[in-house]
């Protein structure tokens, strides 16, 4: 039996300890193969073919400015314009380090995010999936807003209520385009340019991509 306001996949016959259920908790960067059945950001397979990754906080660093992403297009700013938080996490069994970077452009009201993996172990690891970010938040009857279009008319707004399950915008063309724009926003009903809540996520540049709400 599930009580009202129970986490979606947590069976319970009493009100005692539920902390063993990972899908009961908000996750900053969820990983696959450890018992959380929501969408993961990172799936890693080891040399034995086993898939599972569990990262834990190690340390963090805050500094002015923003480091370049080697080989990738990215936003940039001076030490006066942007401040960055790097969070180092690690899976000790795999010897895998994960660096989560958050750069705050305060005047623009923008936070940019990126992820870097560092293999410190002795085995080869296969990255099955890696996503740039996760935003785990309470539902406020959000609607999902996406953009699509055609040549010379790229920005048609499509908006509708979030349904149970998963909704997404994606592309497997190897590039982003007017057909599927790499942008998703969650907005409260009745939101305008002057009022309402808007949480938007957008790739600076993109090949194949997926933006998904669950």
Language-model features, listed with the residues they occupy:
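Polysaccharide-binding surfaces and accessory modules of carbohydrate-active proteins
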Residues: 1-214
